[in-house]
UniProtKB/Swiss-Prot annotation:
Cross-referenced NCBIfam families: uS13_bact (TIGR03631)
InterPro entries in alphabetical order: Rbsml_uS13_C, Ribosomal_uS13, Ribosomal_uS13-like_H2TH, Ribosomal_uS13_bac-type, Ribosomal_uS13_CS
Entry-linked Gene3D superfamilies: 1.10.8.50, 30s ribosomal protein s13, domain 2
GO (cellular component) term, any one: small ribosomal subunit
PROSITE patterns for this protein: RIBOSOMAL_S13_1, RIBOSOMAL_S13_2
Family, similarity comment: Belongs to the universal ribosomal protein uS13 family.
Lineage of producing organism: Bacteria, Bacillati, Cyanobacteriota, Cyanophyceae, Nostocales
Key words, A-Z: Ribonucleoprotein, Ribosomal protein, RNA-binding, rRNA-binding, tRNA-binding
Protein name: Small ribosomal subunit protein uS13
Organism: Nostoc sp. (strain PCC 7120 / SAG 25.82 / UTEX 2576)
Pfam families hit by this protein: Ribosomal_S13
Task of the protein: Located at the top of the head of the 30S subunit, it contacts several helices of the 16S rRNA. In the 70S ribosome it contacts the 23S rRNA (bridge B1a) and protein L5 of the 50S subunit (bridge B1b), connecting the 2 subunits; these bridges are implicated in subunit movement. Contacts the tRNAs in the A and P-sites.
Matches recorded under SUPFAM superfamilies: S13-like H2TH domain
Length: 126
């Protein structure tokens, strides 16, 4: 089992795809890492030698911020925006889109499910 940056890579996937299971590594960054270490991208994770795994682990841990460190960095950046009172910080705090998207309609992912608003009650009939 190849374990890199605290993540168990899926055994039956190609190395190129398996590395993307690490938070902060997408396909292009995965390809950069593989090129730097000289590992064949078509190799399955289960077929990697210990030396290959060690090379990949060394490359990832020395040159990239991934997993917990990256999550902590993102949280600190958002907290800084909130603390200094910027517009972006307020939008983060209110749970609304931060980058200027419209909110009259759409923005459901960021705002959450719709909340039902009670309509007017009819007056009792005579």
């Amino acid at each position: 089992m190849a374990r890199i940056a605290g993540v168990d890579l899926p055994r039956d996937k190609r190395v190129e795809i398996g590395l993307t299971y690490i938070y902060g590594i997408g396909l292009s960054r995965s390809q950069e890492i593989i090129a730097a270490t000289g590992v064949n991208p078509d190799t399955r994770v289960k077929d990697l030698s210990d030396a290959d795994v060690a090379a990949l682990r060394g490359e990832v841990e020395s040159n990239y911020q991934v997993e917990g460190d990256l999550r902590r960095l993102e949280a600190m950046n958002i907290k800084r925006l909130v603390d200094i009172g910027t517009y972006r910080g307020r939008r983060h705090r209110m749970g609304l889109p931060v980058r200027g998207q419209r909110t009259r309609t759409n923005a459901r992912t960021r705002r959450g499910r719709r909340q039902t608003v009670a309509g007017k009650k009819k007056a009792p009939g005579k």
